[in-house]
């Protein structure tokens, strides 16, 4: 793997990273990220960190196939509210041109439980956090045992998140895969897959223009528009929900969702109003196509609830593959403003 490192790259090993699963490599990895080198390579091995890695503008962090970044036992309690595996350095003025490519990002949630949800400096359990970033790429990563969201982004423009495996062996509440907050636009989220029963244990992809940003895992996010996003190639055997669109008054516009495969316990596509008043929602120009999903047994919730206001939404080539009649495929609140064209069919019984 060493031969793949471009000449301009620095290896974290040069800065003292050990990767033996015991040594605290935070300082060495941070020193590498602070070195001014545009590309930092992290070799194979288990790199234990005890506080957030900060990545600045114009930096690529490239991890070997066998590289693991793991939050050390008890590190979150010590680090408190601003604890992630990695985040962009400047969330006040913003960052640009950041790439994280490769590696296993292990939140070690069994040894790093979340803090109290509304306490000011409590750990929220998020894996990676990118807020106010222009030109962001996260690719080829395995997200493991994050206490809440695997990857969250807010106020991002021109972003690509691709080839992400959600590989949780410890199931926790609020384990969203890719969680997108307000003021995010021009994004591609693709080839996101999940391994095993109960994974992920919340929305695989959430586009939440409105939310409760006082909760610890949302701290630092804003309420605001989300627009021009492509979500494609999303697969799981036993997702909680595949894709959520959540809006109260903030607009969600120009969204394409395609190629969803597998099974879900709750919803395939969730447009319910959550805690917001009846009749809310500001969603328009949504295309959903090429869906082949099963409702996994266990509850009677509809695969696609629509209780938010939505205009110009099209669902086409949606095939439901299970034969359970307890759960409806589509449930629309007739008392609100919904403009939806639908092409949904049940697969033939074998």
List each model region and its residues.
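Extracellular/periplasmic carbohydrate-active domains that bind, remodel
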Residues: 1-350
């Amino acid at each position: 793997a060493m031969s793949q490192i471009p000449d301009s790259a620095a290896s974290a090993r040069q800065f003292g990273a050990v990767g033996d699963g015991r040594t605290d490599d935070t300082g060495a990895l941070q020193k590498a990220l602070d070195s001014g080198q545009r590309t930092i390579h992290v070799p194979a091995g288990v790199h234990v960190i005890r506080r957030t890695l900060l990545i600045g503008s114009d930096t690529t962090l490239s991890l070997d196939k066998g590289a693991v970044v793991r939050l050390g036992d008890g590190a979150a309690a010590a680090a408190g509210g601003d604890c992630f595996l990695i985040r962009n350095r400047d969330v006040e003025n913003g960052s640009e041109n950041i790439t994280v490519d490769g590696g296993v990002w292990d939140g070690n949630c069994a040894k790093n439980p979340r803090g109290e949800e509304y306490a000011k400096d409590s750990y929220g359990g998020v894996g990676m956090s990118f807020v106010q970033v222009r030109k962001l790429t996260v690719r080829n990563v395995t997200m493991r045992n994050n206490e809440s969201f695997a990857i969250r982004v807010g106020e991002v423009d021109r972003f690509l998140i691709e080839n992400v495996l959600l590989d949780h062996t410890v199931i926790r509440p609020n384990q969203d895969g890719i969680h997108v907050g307000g003021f995010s636009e021009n994004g591609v989220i693709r080839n996101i897959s999940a391994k095993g029963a109960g994974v992920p244990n919340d929305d695989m992809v959430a586009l939440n223009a409105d939310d409760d940003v006082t909760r610890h895992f949302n701290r630092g996010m804003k309420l605001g528009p989300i627009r021009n996003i492509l979500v494609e190639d999303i697969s799981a055997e036993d997702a909680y929900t595949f894709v959520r669109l959540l809006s109260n008054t903030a607009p969600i516009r120009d969204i394409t969702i395609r190629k969803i495969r597998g099974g879900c316990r709750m919803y395939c596509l969730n447009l319910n109003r959550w805690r917001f008043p009846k009749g809310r929602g500001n969603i328009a120009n949504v295309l959903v196509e090429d869906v082949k999903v099963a409702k996994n047994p266990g509850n009677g919730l509809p695969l696609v609830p629509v209780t938010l206001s939505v205009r110009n939404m099209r669902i086409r080539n949606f095939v439901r593959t299970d034969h359970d009649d307890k759960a409806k495929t589509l449930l629309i609140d007739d008392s609100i403003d919904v403009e939806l064209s639908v092409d949904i069919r049940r697969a033939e019984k074998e």
